[in-house]
Amino acid sequence: MSRSKRLQTGQLRARFAAGLSAMYAAEVPAYGTLVEVCAQVNSDYLTRHRRAERLGSLQRVTAERHGAIRVGNPAELAAVADLFAAFGMLPVGYYDLRTAESPIPVVSTAFRPIDANELAHNPFRVFTSMLAIEDRRYFDADLRTRVQTFLARRQLFDPALLAQARAIAADGGCDADDAPAFVAAAVAAFALSREPVEKSWYDELSRVSAVAADIAGVGSTHINHLTPRVLDIDDLYRRMTERGITMIDTIQGPPRTDGPDVLLRQTSFRALAEPRMFRDEDGTVTPGILRVRFGEVEARGVALTPRGRERYEAAMAAADPAAVWATHFPSTDAEMAAQGLAYYRGGDPSAPIVYEDFLPASAAGIFRSNLDRDSQTGDGPDDAGYNVDWLAGAIGRHIHDPYALYDALAQEERR
């Protein structure tokens, strides 16, 4: 008897990303429009720009997605880590959105591939946020206890699914015959639940933060947004607006310049009013709407070194970053490489290393642009103790340093 064909974790990841994209397009039709317009923009950009694929092949860019999910506590985050490991996605970076200009009561990491070949094959990544319930500025003792009790009662993932994920991660893949059911179950775990929402509990959490309500006010998690990659985000923004899609007011991240694109630029269409059922305190179930899910799009540039990141932060602190950009950054890749501001494979200015991660200010800005009001923060110090070491210990996994990963890629010779 011949042995069944095996699929590696990277192949499973490609199927997982495609499955989530298909599901989200069915749930949020405007996302399908976004993907369609991205494809048109990318095709047109490729015909106009000789070096359009300098930061990734069109095949990679077209397939590229990042997702965002939210969980409530370390146990749930650890379960997410176990599931994503089966797709070759490891935790990279630490983001504290409580420190943003518009604070959000979450701390986050991103699960993604870290190997260059895996990134080239399929770079799917998921920005994963955990509710910061230990922060007394948002949650007093009584509310914290009730949130903890609520989270302890729910189960985000079938234990059998997690057991299978751990086995696949340990083996580096699975038999092809087992893959469809596993991927389908993993995708289904992030579908929007149709269970009625307890209205009084959801409303109470909403007074703290709409994000807190989205995390701990419902019995499951879901894809909050999926994000295709586009080569010209300004053109994308214009085309979406022309189609009558309401976009947020700005493009988050660095300004458009004549020099090399750096880091990450993001925008989105506004969160849509989606019908949900609500359960009142007397048990009555009535229809209502929630605005929690939206469609984001991103354009990625070259990864900056710590020195380059310092200059970026200085430029973005200006009232008009575009006006001062040239005082912080040169206009060519050769100068960027010579000054040690960005990462290039083997030091070759013609081989930029794409930024694979996120910007906390942009993430918080996107979240805030799709909320009706700011989070309510109380007075007092931040004594919750959240940091990258705490998060790594809480989930029992090493959280990779993005700069160390870029340094390693930069040591490789150009292919």
Curated annotation (Swiss-Prot):
Site positions for Important for substrate specificity: 70
Cofactor: Fe(2+)
Broad class of enzyme this protein falls into: oxidoreductase
Keyword NADP: no
Alphabetical list of Gene3D superfamilies matching this protein: Uncharacterised protein PF07063, DUF1338 (3.10.180.80)
Keyword Lyase in annotation: no
Keywords: Dioxygenase, Iron, Metal-binding, Oxidoreductase
Residue numbers binding Fe(2+): 66, 225, 296
Reactions catalysed, as given in the entry: 2-oxoadipate + O2 = (R)-2-hydroxyglutarate + CO2
Enzyme Commission code(s) on record: 1.13.11.93
GO MF, one example: metal ion binding
Known function: Catalyzes the decarboxylation and hydroxylation of 2-oxoadipate (2OA) to form D-2-hydroxyglutarate (D-2-HGA).
Homology family: Belongs to the 2-oxoadipate dioxygenase/decarboxylase family.
Name of the protein described by the UniProt record: 2-oxoadipate dioxygenase/decarboxylase
Lineage of source species: Bacteria, Bacillati, Actinomycetota, Actinomycetes, Mycobacteriales
